[in-house]
């Protein structure tokens, strides 16, 4: 059993067309009521909407967050060749951009987890208000420096007194 082959092919489009016709009729009635009440200004059909497809998908950030600036002060920037002379076992490439490290390149050496990254790669990561290693998620700020970091961040925020003076109500 079942439906005849042509039944669904005709039924669904016909139902769709009837639904659209009913919606069009309701629209006409609503517009007529608005015109009758003198509210036709609210029915501007000439309204042009901005074309958001021509805008860039993301507006680039122009400033770094305070926390990123403070973390940059904490994390050392050194040349890669200085680390190679120290005799430590170092990765061959940056885990963010996957380019190899070269002797004169500036890198940031994370104190907590000992990972290294190109300076520009890690700075871009911090500009997005990230406060952990991109590889292992260990916090950038060592535990022994966390209190000092929080105080400097509080001072940089511009809020000098969090607590309001208590006044009596009459």
Swiss-Prot record:
Pfam name, any one: zf-RING_2
Superkingdom in the source lineage: Eukaryota
UniProt-listed SMART domains: RING, RINGv
Tissue spec: Highly expressed in stems, rosette leaves and siliques, and moderately expressed in roots, cauline leaves and flower. Detected at low levels in seeds.
Subcellular localization: Membrane
Keyword Lipid biosynthesis appears in the UniProt entry: no
GO molecular function ontology, one term from the record: zinc ion binding
Bilayer-spanning residue ranges: 15-37
Induction, per UniProt: Repressed by brassinosteroids (BRs) such as brassinolide and 24-epi-brassinolide in a BRI1-dependent manner. Induced rapidly but transiently induced by chitin, a fungal pathogen elicitor.
PANTHER family tied to this protein: BRASSINOSTEROID-RESPONSIVE RING PROTEIN 1 (PTHR45969:SF10), RING ZINC FINGER PROTEIN-RELATED (PTHR45969)
Protein family (similarity comment): Belongs to the RING-type zinc finger family.
Name listed for the protein in its UniProt record: Brassinosteroid-responsive RING protein 1
Protein species of origin: Arabidopsis thaliana
Taxonomic classification: Eukaryota, Viridiplantae, Streptophyta, Embryophyta, Tracheophyta
Gene, per the UniProt record: BRH1
């Amino acid at each position: 059993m079942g439906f005849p082959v042509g039944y669904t092919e005709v039924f669904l489009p016909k139902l769709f067309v009837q639904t659209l016709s009913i919606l069009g009729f309701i629209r006409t009635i609503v517009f007529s009521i608005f015109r009758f009440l003198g509210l036709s200004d609210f029915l501007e059909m000439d309204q042009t909407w901005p074309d958001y497809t021509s805008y860039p998908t993301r507006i680039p950030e122009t400033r770094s967050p305070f926390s990123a600036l403070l973390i940059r002060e904490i994390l050392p920037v050194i040349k890669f060749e200085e680390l190679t002379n120290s005799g430590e076992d170092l990765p061959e490439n940056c885990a963010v951009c996957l380019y190899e490290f070269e002797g004169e390149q500036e890198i940031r050496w994370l104190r907590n987890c000992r990972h290294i990254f190109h300076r520009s790669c890690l700075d871009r990561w911090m500009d997005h208000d990230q406060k952990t290693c991109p590889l292992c998620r260990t916090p950038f700020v060592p535990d022994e420096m966390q209190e000092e970091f929080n105080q400097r961040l509080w001072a940089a925020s511009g809020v000098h007194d969090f607590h309001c003076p208590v006044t009596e109500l009459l």
